[in-house]
Amino acid sequence: MSQRITIDPVTRIEGHLRIDCEIENGVVSKAWASGTMWRGMEEIVKNRDPRDAWMIVQRICGVCTTTHALSSVRAAESALNIDVPVNAQYIRNIILAAHTTHDHIVHFYQLSALDWVDITSALQADPTKASEMLKGVSTWHLNSPEEFTKVQNKIKDLVASGQLGIFANGYWGHPAMKLPPEVNLIAVAHYLQALECQRDANRVVALLGGKTPHIQNLAVGGVANPINLDGLGVLNLERLMYIKSFIDKLSDFVEQVYKVDTAVIAAFYPEWLTRGKGAVNYLSVPEFPTDSKNGSFLFPGGYIENADLSSYRPITSHSDEYLIKGIQESAKHSWYKDEAPQAPWEGTTIPAYDGWSDDGKYSWVKSPTFYGKTVEVGPLANMLVKLAAGRESTQNKLNEIVAIYQKLTGNTLEVAQLHSTLGRIIGRTVHCCELQDILQNQYSALITNIGKGDHTTFVKPNIPATGEFKGVGFLEAPRGMLSHWMVIKDGIISNYQAVVPSTWNSGPRNFNDDVGPYEQSLVGTPVADPNKPLEVVRTIHSFDPCMACAVHVVDADGNEVVSVKVL
């Protein structure tokens, strides 16, 4: 007998997401992912100066602000054929790497970890045993018995108060929770320590960007960071050294805590290396430009079809015609007019809500495709593309996680197992580890270039008063490939579309009725208790949904409390 469960809204994500599943014999047989809010930001920037768009569209989201700002600036620079000073590229790259580091740490600890960690079980842990478990795999200075005892006492105080505070409403004691008490205690301690690490990442962003969220230093043509090593109120030597101190602290936490915790979770939940396979077509764009024309990058891009790394097709630049021509969005199952597939430059965002229907329209998210195929974007796609491209650093970072996994389990971990729920989490960790090298590299590049006497950070753009110009700004954001598509006509924006990572991944069935990546990833997932569908939430959280970005103002009648309906 089949059952229907509805989770509305899914929590510990950004925005509002509803998931519906049909369950037969304890396993998900069908799924629907529904974005339940409408954004409409594209309509707001029409008829405005293209230099203003980045400041507005970063308000699409309070989490992904920096990525939208930079993607929008790149779109305008693409349309106007502007060469960006390399100092501006270095500064932008440092901001993006620090922002993404922050985002990945937030996802693992604050948004995803509580799907795997039983907070109450940590009360039974032996702090000394917990500390001993980490010897040989981590040198983190806060892995001492004394530190773990302090954390355990905090949990005891919360339980004694009758309120678990930030740890309330978890599925504690769920049969799918498998970590021993000591590992649960370690995870809670690192959850709390991660909060301070996130502050360090944001300090890097704020020192260069003016503030965060919603940075202030970008400009079409570069950045608004005047450089004078001896000056005041500018990017000087003191501020640069301050930034470097936070970069060094970030690297220590990522390498000694985040990387190790990822391997530990995988070691105790190996079955989740076989669950959660999504679209198996993967798309990622090159990132971290090192020249003024966005033609040379530190990270490669590419496309992989049907989980076959040998099918890898390189994408070498943001102006790659193969990339640009392959992207379309349709709205057959979304609450918009113009259902047929459209290129983003021609796309519209006109709402047409007519109720929720299994076989009809059921989401505010559109359905992007790449040459007609559903694809997954994000850290898993990014990792697989870089592995297929032969990037040595990516393989080395993955090998380090696999080595810890092997030490704990005695088993190896194959690439084929990465097409999974835990594969996405591992991909995100590999990406974050590589970002620490990017931060060091781009900081050194900036210092070296300044030392050569180049202090240029901005070139004034020329916006023709007549004529039409099209541009697209691609960016590999924390959740995957982001693109902003801008049409400038007679000096102002005539059309604007954002095709964001969570649109690619959370999109409903497309024009050909193919299911979206979220929906595909849930099929085959076992659910032990339909009233507590932890297994469903684990896989959805592995994508790190950001629905404020994905949808095209929140319903005033929306629930703030999670509702799980079993029919």
From Swiss-Prot:
It is found in: Cell membrane. The keyword Nucleotide-binding does not apply. Residues 553-567 form a propeptide. It catalyses: H2 + A = AH2. SUPFAM superfamilies: HydB/Nqo4-like. GO terms for molecular function: ferredoxin hydrogenase activity; hydrogenase (acceptor) activity; nickel cation binding. Keywords: Cell membrane, Membrane, Metal-binding, Nickel, Oxidoreductase. The record marks 552-553 as: Cleavage. This is one of three E.coli hydrogenases synthesized in response to different physiological conditions. HYD2 is involved in hydrogen uptake. This is Hydrogenase-2 large chain. The lineage of its organism: Bacteria, Pseudomonadati, Pseudomonadota, Gammaproteobacteria, Enterobacterales.
